């Protein structure tokens, strides 16, 4: 009997050993394991931020476009983004038009800035190694097309006063208005610059007669509505020492409304 008791007591410490091994603390997680475990939480927060921003953007864009939010309650995310892009493009066009109407030099500055940026991109692509040739060609082609569109934009036309002198687009000469005798016909602007009497050779240019002068300059002759349509013309000069010349067939007494003082001169 004592032998059995001694055998049982000697075996009890061995049986308790596995329990002490199982209670050891786990090893700390590595950085990669921590990222993997926290990734679902970060993804959930990111989606919540996106949905919150899209909700605010939907409210703003519907208010800006003056649309009823109750009729557009189920807009997709792509629809909200497309509406926002279109609205911003329209705002950009309006701002550009307003800037051009107040300061016509804005378009010239924009062209100069775009051209400078295009030159810098071209210089970088020509010196940078590792850029695919196809990518370089497509990028430069896109910039060239944009530059052509910008160059095709026109300056806004400014309203001209009836008696104001404006340069002729082809010759750069002042526009001189000759009042006619008929009240229903509006005066036609002509460009003239001449130092002497007209010679015999005359050509038609833009509906007017172009008469070359002996000194190499030109004069435009315009028909007066007070006379018949069979060939009477009135030359207008910009030189103060040259009077208003009439053809031999026209008498000064038949045109009281056209005098030297009635012609506006810029000097």
Curated annotation (Swiss-Prot):
GO molecular function: bHLH transcription factor binding; protein heterodimerization activity; RNA polymerase II cis-regulatory region sequence-specific DNA binding; sequence-specific DNA binding
Tissue note: Starting from late neurula stage, weakly expressed in midline neural cells, where expression is restricted to the superficial layer of the prospective floorplate. Expressed in the posterior somitic mesoderm (PSM) at tailbud stage. During early tailbud stages, broadly expressed within the pronephric mesoderm both around and inside the developing pronephros. During late tailbud to early tadpole stages, expressed more ventrally in the pronephros, and although initially expressed in both the lateral and medial layers, by these later stages expression is predominantly in the lateral layer.
Motif (WRPW motif): 264-267
Cysteine pairs bridged by disulfides in the record: none
Biased composition (Low complexity): 10-22
Residues spanning the signal sequence: none
CDD domains: bHLH-O_HES1_4
Domain comment in the entry: Has a particular type of basic domain (presence of a helix-interrupting proline) that binds to the N-box (CACNAG), rather than the canonical E-box (CANNTG).
Function noted in UniProt: Transcriptional repressor of a subset of early mesodermal genes including myod1 and t/bra. Binds DNA on N-box motifs: 5'-CACNAG-3'. Acts as a negative regulator of myogenesis, mediating Notch signaling to repress expression of myod1.
Protein name: Transcription factor HES-1-A
Organism from which the protein derives: Xenopus laevis
Name of the gene this protein is made from: hes1-a
